């Protein structure tokens, strides 16, 4: 049996992965856990998400599915933050005998849930048509993520996955400041990077794997294998851990990105790879946000932004000039593309002008007056105009990313990038 669960948390607390970790232990009373649990991040632009827009799935071999359904439903009722308007839990249950029949349709549903916008009605209609056991609470929006997580569990061989070690706090500490030795996170990063990432942000001197909300998570270490995330976690010095779970996840895979042939294809609440030419110089707005325009081959334009939380990434963006050919990865909201990564494919030349140099003495000539050229007062040599030089761009073609402190869950870090046709510039 595959169990998918979503939308049990709120902005004020709880975490669907914590419920998953509890069920990993509790459901062993009814059977055997067959594989690592799954943590599936969905479309990051959805406005009614609580925090990270994540669903979980568990796979269990059991002879008593009805007891499993009853137990899971009871635990959701007990732990979900039902008082929160945005919290609308959902759970679905896929029987072993239905894996083959449901695999293709739920795999497609997963892709849609990560890259598109799905209405609750579509999930409920699909559940009804396919005869899937389910339980929705309130408006049942969590059924969308629950179905998608089941689709991921049915397609483990076909998807790119990473892993996350999630450590959870003792319940009496929830809502209090986390007690962690920040230095130990930098030590763990030094020991395990680049097989782990987004533990710390070296440039901005921040620990980024420790949340600040009131949820049960103490920290989360992301990496390429269960072994490496467990190794990194073992190096952390912090308050006592109630329990931990290692999730297989689509985090750090760029699964949310769609290829856009042109700007006309882009829509709000979707994420894209988009190629174009810088058409207006970057400008810094109030609040520190950096905005510039990109034009595609058809002549359409879109505003692109490196917002203040991207910190030092904005310095790179400010170096762009009209004519630079780039490829952007990011999400479109309110008609503006929020940049996650930028590939600088080619740089436009920039020029500077200087007074001509005297061929006799090697010093710069002085202006003889408006429209009268230039003359060396010492040697008497003259020249009709300034001399034009190609300037240094202080920027190289290559692939760049926002710093770890600003990276979205689904964005693929450059340490995972396998391309060898360009210079990679991982943010640290």
Curated annotation (Swiss-Prot):
Statement: the UniProt record of this protein carries the keyword Cytoplasm: yes
One GO BP annotation of this record: tRNA wobble cytosine modification
UniProtKB keywords: ATP-binding, Cytoplasm, Ligase, Nucleotide-binding, tRNA processing
Enzyme class: ligase
Signal peptide: none
Any single GO CC term annotated in Swiss-Prot or TrEMBL for this entry: cytoplasm
Compartment annotation: Cytoplasm
Catalysis performed (reactions): cytidine(34) in tRNA(Ile2) + agmatine + ATP + H2O = 2-agmatinylcytidine(34) in tRNA(Ile2) + AMP + 2 phosphate + 2 H(+)
GO terms for MF: ATP binding; ligase activity, forming carbon-nitrogen bonds
Major subcellular location class: cytoplasm
Pfam (any one): Zn_ribbon_TiaS
Keyword Heme attributed: no
EC number: 6.3.4.22
Function: ATP-dependent agmatine transferase that catalyzes the formation of 2-agmatinylcytidine (agm2C) at the wobble position (C34) of tRNA(Ile2), converting the codon specificity from AUG to AUA.
Protein family: Belongs to the TiaS family.
Protein name stated in the entry: tRNA(Ile2) 2-agmatinylcytidine synthetase TiaS
Species: Methanosarcina mazei (strain ATCC BAA-159 / DSM 3647 / Goe1 / Go1 / JCM 11833 / OCM 88) (Methanosarcina frisia)
């Amino acid at each position: 049996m595959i169990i998918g669960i979503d939308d049990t948390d709120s902005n004020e607390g709880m975490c669907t992965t914590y419920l998953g970790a509890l069920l990993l232990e509790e459901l062993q009373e009814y059977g055997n856990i067959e594989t690592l649990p799954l943590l599936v991040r969905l479309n990051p632009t959805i406005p009614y998400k609580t925090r990270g827009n994540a669903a979980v799935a568990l796979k269990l071999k059991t002879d008593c599915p009805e007891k499993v359904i009853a137990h899971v439903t009871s635990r959701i009722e007990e732990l979900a933050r039902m008082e929160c308007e945005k919290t609308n839990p959902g759970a679905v249950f896929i029987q072993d005998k239905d894996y083959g029949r449901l695999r293709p349709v739920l795999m497609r549903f997963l892709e849609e849930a990560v890259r598109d916008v799905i209405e609750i009605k579509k999930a409920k209609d699909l559940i009804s048509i396919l005869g899937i056991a389910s339980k929705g609470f309130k408006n049942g929006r969590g059924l969308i993520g629950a179905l998608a997580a089941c689709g991921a569990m049915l397609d483990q061989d076909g998807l790119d996955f990473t892993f996350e070690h999630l450590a959870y706090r003792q319940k009496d500490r929830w809502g209090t400041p986390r007690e962690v030795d920040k230095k130990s996170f930098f030590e763990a990063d030094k020991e395990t990077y680049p097989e782990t990432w987004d533990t710390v942000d070296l440039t901005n001197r921040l620990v980024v794997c420790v949340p600040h909300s009131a949820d049960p998570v103490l920290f989360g270490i992301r990496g390429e294998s269960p072994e490496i995330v467990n190794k990194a976690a073992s190096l952390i010095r912090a308050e006592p851990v109630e329990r931990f779970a290692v999730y297989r996840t689509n985090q750090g895979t760029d699964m949310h990105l769609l290829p856009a042939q042109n700007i006309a294809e882009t829509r709000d609440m979707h994420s894209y790879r988009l190629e174009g030419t810088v058409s207006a110089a970057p400008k810094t707005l109030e609040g520190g946000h950096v905005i510039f325009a990109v034009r595609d081959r058809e002549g359409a334009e879109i505003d692109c932004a490196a917002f203040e939380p991207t910190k030092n990434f904005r310095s790179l963006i400010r170096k762009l000039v009209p004519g630079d050919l780039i490829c952007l990865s990011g999400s479109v909201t309110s008609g503006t593309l929020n940049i996650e990564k930028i590939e600088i494919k080619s740089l436009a030349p920039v020029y500077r002008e200087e007074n001509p140099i005297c061929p006799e003495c090697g010093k710069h000539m002085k202006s003889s007056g408006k429209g009268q050229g230039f003359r060396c007062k010492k040697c008497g040599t003259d020249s009709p105009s300034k001399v034009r030089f190609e300037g240094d761009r202080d920027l190289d073609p290559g692939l760049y990313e926002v710093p770890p402190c600003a990276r979205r869950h689904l964005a693929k870090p450059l340490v995972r990038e396998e391309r060898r046709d360009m210079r990679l510039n991982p943010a640290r």
